[in-house]
Every structure is written in C-alpha cells, then in structure tokens.
C-alpha cells in the first residue's frame, strides 16, 4: 500500500504483504509472436529458471480474446504447483481482446473472429518452434469467450494440442443467441439469423466442426448448472457430440458443477476443489510428475 502526501508531494510505502508463494526460482518475461498477417501478439511466459528448451516441457497456454477485455499478466497461486514441477505457463493477448485498444478488439470480432483463433494457433506453433514444448506436451485453457477460443482451436488444429480445459464455454454459435442473455452478444459475434453472419459463424462454431473420424485432444469441459450467462447446454451438447464420434479415442469429459453458475456463487473452498480437479486433469494429461 502506497500513500501520497499532498503537502510534501511525496510517495511513501506504508504496507506490503508478504507473497504467499516462494517465487524466487520462477522467471517471467514478455515476448512478441508474429501472427499470420504480421501483427505482433503480446505473450507472457512464466517458468522455472532452470528450464531447458528441449521441446519436452509441459506447457499451458491461457487465452481469452474477446469483448475488448484486456487480460493483464497474472500468476495465480493455483498454477505454482504446475510451474514448480517444470511446467510453462503462457498468457497470450490474442486479438478480440483490448490489449491494444479498440482496433485490436475489432480485428477479432464479427466477420474477423477467426483472427482470434489464428493468433492462438500462431502462439502455440511458436512455443513448439522455440522448443518450449511439443504438441504432445501442450495444453490450452480458456473460459467463457475463452472457452469458445479453446473449442475452436482444438477442432481446427487437433494435432497441435495434447489437452484442453474448456470452461463455461460458448460452443454452438448458430443458436447461441437464443438462450439466456446471449442475444446481447450479437454485436460481438454477429446475428446467426442473418445470412452473412450465419456463414462466418458456421465456419468456426466448435459444435458444428466436430469431424467424423477425427480424434480431438484430451479435454475437460467445465460448466455450471446455474450459469445465467452462458447456458450449460453448450458444454453438454458439445461433449455428447464428441463422445458419439467413433473416431474419438482420447478422453473427452464433462465436469458439471450443480451448485454454481458462470464461475460465481462458490466459496473459496469450492474454488480450491474445482481448481485442484482441473490441475490434476492437466498434469495427468501432460504426464507431469514430481513433488514440488
């Protein structure tokens, strides 16, 4: 906590909390990844200082990319176990978000929404190319609009990811506007009842792009039964569609929370339990071991 003295015009640090985690062995840095069209995507990477770029590191790519929301760099305590076991945590500011203002947002909305997914794929490919990881050790995670991003990239590039965590997602983009408050998102995604929007939405709608005979990455889809924003039907029907695909060999799981909504209404203890479940899924899928 910092106080400002209006008379002396001086700043004074009056209180500082001790960090709850020992981060002395962790390094974080920002890099820029070239998108398909030459745009520079800001990417934050956190990992242990002794990391070797040998292509064998379990890596989690976190994405959102929508509604002009800026996802600021963060290091949640819940990721510390993953990183301390040799994992790499990556946060990518893909287009559709607000990292560089409204223009950055506009380049990833409506008819340009595919740009959000192309940026995510570009970052994933860069991580592999720079030997942080490999497709066999790479996972992608996102919630809400970020869940849509996850659903899109795993259906478009299932070969690029080993696993995915898809939280409270939109996945049926042809009927999304018919449920709950989603009609208010038409300015962001487009109106499926209009022919031009219908065409671009159908091209990337994850539910409509589950291909027969194609095995999607091992995935945990998380939804809340009382979600008042994104109807849990998206998660339920998507998982059912994938599980009915005879070519789906990897586990594709639905985790329903019958006591919560869009990530809200949970006690601290419930959030800890849920995050523990997700991270155990992640570590099992990426074969993370160790006791740190």
Regions found by a protein language model. Name each.
Residues 57, 64-69, 144:
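Active-site glycine-rich loops that stabilize anionic/oxyanionic intermediates
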Residues 49-51, 66-69, 126-130, 244:
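Conserved helix-loop functional segments at active or binding sites
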Residues 1-55, 69, 73-80, 84-85, ...:
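Non-catalytic accessory segments flanking enzyme active sites
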Residues 68-74, 99, 233:
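Glycine/threonine-rich flexible loop motifs
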Residues 59, 83-93, 253:
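A fold-wide structural signal in alpha/beta-hydrolase
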């Amino acid at each position: 906590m910092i106080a400002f003295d209006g008379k002396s015009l001086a700043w004074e640090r009056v209180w500082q909390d001790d960090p709850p985690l020992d981060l002395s062995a962790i390094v974080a840095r920002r890099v820029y990844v070239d998108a398909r069209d030459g745009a520079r995507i800001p990417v934050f990477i956190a990992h242990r200082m002794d990391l070797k770029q040998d292509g064998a590191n379990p890596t989690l790519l976190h994405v959102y990319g929508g509604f002009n929301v800026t996802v600021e760099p963060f290091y949640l305590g819940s990721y510390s176990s993953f990183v301390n076991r040799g994992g790499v945590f990556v946060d990518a500011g893909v287009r559709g978000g607000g990292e560089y203002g409204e223009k950055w947002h506009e380049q990833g909305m409506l008819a340009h929404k595919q740009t959000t997914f192309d940026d995510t794929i570009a970052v994933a490919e860069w991580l592999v190319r720079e030997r942080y990881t490999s497709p066999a050790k790479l996972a992608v995670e996102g919630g809400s609009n970020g869940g849509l991003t996850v659903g899109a990239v795993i259906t478009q590039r299932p070969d690029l990811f080993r696993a995915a965590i898809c939280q409270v997602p939109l996945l049926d983009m042809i009927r999304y506007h018919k449920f709950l408050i989603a009609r208010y998102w038409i300015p962001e995604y487009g109106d499926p009842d209009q022919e031009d929007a219908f065409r671009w939405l159908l091209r990337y709608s994850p539910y409509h792009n589950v291909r027969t005979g194609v095995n999607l990455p091992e995935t945990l889809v998380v939804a809340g039964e009382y979600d008042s924003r994104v109807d849990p039907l998206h998660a339920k029907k998507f998982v059912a569609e994938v599980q009915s695909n005879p070519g789906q060999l990897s586990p594709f799981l639905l985790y329903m929370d019958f006591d919560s909504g869009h990530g809200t209404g949970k006690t601290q203890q419930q959030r800890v339990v849920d995050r523990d479940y997700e991270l155990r899924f992640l570590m099992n899928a990426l074969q993370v071991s160790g006791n740190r």
